[in-house]
Amino acid sequence: MKKKILCFQFRHETNVFCPVKGDTVAYKKMRYLFGKESFDNMRGVGTELGAFLEVFEKRDDVELIPTIAFYASPCGYVTPDVYDLACEKIKEAIIANAPIDAVLADVHGAMVPEGRSDGEGDLFEMIRELVGWDIPIIAPLDLHANVTKKMAKCATALIPYEEYPHVDIYETGLNAARLMEATLDGKIKPTMAYRRVPFLLPFFPTEREEIKPLYKIAREIEAREGVYSARFAHGFFPADIEEIGMSVMVVTDNDQALAEKYADELEAAIKAQLPKLKIDYPTLDEALAEADEDGDGPVVIADASDNPGAGATGDTTHILRAILEKGIRGAALATILDPASVEACEAAGAGNYVDLQLGGWTDPKYSGGPLAVKAYVRMITDGKYLVKGKIAHGVIAEHGKTAVVDIAGNLVIITSAPRQPYDLEIFRSHGIQPEEQRILVVKSAIHYRADYGKVARKMITLSLDGYAVADPKGYDYKNWKGNV
């Protein structure tokens, strides 16, 4: 008899400070798929669910049970209708296909639904109540997961990414799927130890020297006999739940004591390194002065605080305003979220000028207020392109209806749907060659470095006003009680 593996994707990275909710509209803009369609759209795509399919669809002794593939761009709280529907569809699939032999969950690890504090933990608990405690539940996680006690209790194994930028999304999915495969084949019995490290880490790229010693220790532990995985998650501080922060997960083969021992070792190493895990950010004036100097290749300025990939609104005007005030030319900016301006550009038509009140529509304090500009409309597109870089390779990125305009010698991509523009195809698909620009401005914190590093002579990350400040000291927490 074939072994039945329930597979689903239900992802959200929740920034509770963002006023835009993770509702049905937000999910439909990105990914909102049911049943067989959830597999058909993820097959051959560089996601965790795509990795599950890659490993198990080759086997004729396994039946993969499709459920849902829900993904929305990071934003505010997930609304109850979305969360409840996802849980109901997963529950229905479990009941209809009972008995289930295993569950592979493609989740982020930092979901906060309205009225709840632990989206994934509550979901895993529901699944456990339905399938019991004897079958494996394994989940790859985002590096920025806030791993809670409930998540660790209800899951058999949790394996977060190792890289930021997240160039190892697919590899981590394969890792989790292969652990499940070995488990079902009787080659391994996963036992996991979990430690919570109550510290809020800034958005910290794993290429920085300060954090490299921790990955060296984790990989040394992972290479030891009896260990399958030794990982730590950075946490996602804008979620503002009681259990935000760093965490450690060590998975061994049927040896809980060994897992506990090595989890203690990795936790101690992290705590010893914490005083060094700090980042200083330059001012906007400093960044623009450096970027405006002549050099070979563009300078990339990343606006981390308006990163849609961390739940920001994507509409801030701080950097564009400063560029225009300083008379800088030759910059290309991706992106400003402003559906009304896109509609105005479409009405004017490509090849014509249009007066815009651009961006800054969410909140003058955070978004900078709208910019009154005269823009030359270069093109209108559907905002879709194929991601060609390593992060989410093969995914169709969708920014909604999009306008490309020239404002005083600077090119600006205006979109209708929020999405982090971490792939250079955001420019190329809109007629802009990134290598030929003096300055590239991107609404991203760290992910941009994976692809933009191919063309940049320098990359500068800023932490300005916005809903996704790069430094955890920038928030007024209501639920978090630990150390920053």
What are these regions (language model features)?
Residues 53-74, 78-82, 86-94:
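Low-complexity, highly charged intrinsically disordered N-terminal segments
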